[in-house]
A protein has these predicted regions:
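Conserved NTP-binding catalytic cores of kinases and kinase-like/nucleotidyltransferase enzymes
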Residues: 1-84, 210, 319, 323-326, ...
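A cross-family kinase active-site recognition segment
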Residues: 112-167
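Protein kinase catalytic-loop region centered on the HRD/HxD motif
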Residues: 189-194
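Active-site Asp-x-Gly
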Residues: 195, 206-257
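Conserved catalytic-loop position in the HRD/HxD motif
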Residues: 199
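Catalytic-loop signature of eukaryotic-like protein kinases
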Residues: 202-204
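ATP/Mg2+ or Mg2+-diphosphate-binding catalytic cores
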Residues: 272-339
């Protein structure tokens, strides 16, 4: 459920000082986990302002802004442009956080969409040149389980979080071993990298006329599987993604070992996000709520279907076989989400 945060004291003054905005209206907007977001109306039009205060995340938010601007400069209209401050900066400091303003994107988050629509958009981003781009590149590392283990030893971690981790101890160890295995396989080939979003399906918007893809905080130079792994348990969807990117000029074939790697990696990435957020939460009540969310994530969440598919592929190579079968089977397009 999306939270709506109140308007902080001084935000209007900051926007006027840093951006020269004459505000007509400001109101909380739907936001993700880390960012506090507001819709602002000015004499020049409407914008979104997003503030990230989290010590464990705000620097990645700051680092993503030049990449967002590069994408927008490349003619990608569905990625809202970053609005520069009066001094030409892409962000400013506010109450210990990073504040940035974006062009207004009308519409709402799509709970359901055709993968052809999403990957038709992403293909335009994948087609952008990346040589000389100052962007972190994928290394297919496998150290993240150790990071999670270190965070789990923090004395201030709530008991509820410790209990949740103990209940999944054997599964966590198995996933760590699988991650190490696929890390070793994937590190042998670091070719065919593109600008990837990292959570595209959760940030795909539409107003019925056009699409928007927002929140590029986790942008990275990586293979397309970094975006596609969420469809790991649905070979027909992977088939549709494959066909869509190829039809849009991206000469690449999805690789099952990379899909497996990201399934295991993101299990730990989300876990690390929970643990880091619990430990850096400004309020004890907020930390307790995140601990409860982490317990629910570990107990039963959408990611286990992807992990089950990856596990099956390790023992039976069933993912590669089912994906190959899906490629041979004509996939009827679900049609565009747009009317």
């Amino acid at each position: 459920m999306e939270e709506r945060f109140p308007i902080p004291a001084g935000l209007s003054d900051c926007l006027q000082t840093e951006y020269g905005f004459v505000l007509r209206d400001i109101a909380p907007a739907e936001r993700g986990f880390y960012g506090e977001t507001w819709k602002i109306r000015t004499h020049a039009g409407a914008y979104f302002a997003k503030l990230d205060r989290w010590p464990c995340h705000k620097e990645s938010y700051r680092a993503s802004l030049p990449i967002v601007q590069y994408i927008a400069d490349g003619g990608i209209a569905f990625v809202p442009r970053v609005i520069a401050t009066r001094r030409g900066q892409l962000c400013c400091a506010f109450q210990g956080g990073i504040l940035a303003v974006f062009a207004f994107a009308p519409g709402a988050l799509l709970e359901e969409y055709a993968v052809e629509d999403l990957y038709g958009c992403l293909s335009q981003v994948y087609a952008l040149r990346t040589d000389g781009l100052a962007l972190e590149a994928e290394d297919f590392g496998c150290a993240i389980p150790q990071t999670c283990a270190r965070l789990a030893q923090a004395p201030e971690l709530p008991d509820a979080a410790r209990v949740a981790l103990e209940k999944r101890q054997s599964a966590i160890a198995r996933y760590a071993n699988r991650l190490a295995r696929f890390s070793a396989i994937c590190q042998k080939d670091r070719s065919d990298f593109h600008i990837t979003h990292g959570d595209a399906g959760g940030n795909f918007l539409s107003d019925g006329k056009q699409f928007f893809l927002v929140d590029w905080d986790s942008v990275k130079l990586a293979p397309i599987e970094r975006d596609a792994w969420v469809f790991m348990s649905n070979p027909a969807q992977l088939c549709a993604i494959q066909r869509t990117i190829n039809q849009n000029g991206i000469a690449y074939s999805l690789r099952w070992e990379r899909l497996c790697y990201y399934s295991y990696f993101y299990f730990f990435s989300y876990l690390e996000g929970y643990l880091s957020s619990i430990l850096s939460a400004a309020q004890e009540r907020r930390g307790a709520q995140i601990a409860a969310d982490m317990a629910a994530y570990l107990a039963d969440s959408w990611i286990y279907a992807r992990l089950d598919a990856a596990d099956a592929s390790v023992t039976e190579n069933s993912l590669a076989a089912s994906f190959a079968q899906a490629e041979k089977t004509p996939c009827k397009s679900a049609g565009s989400t747009l009317q």
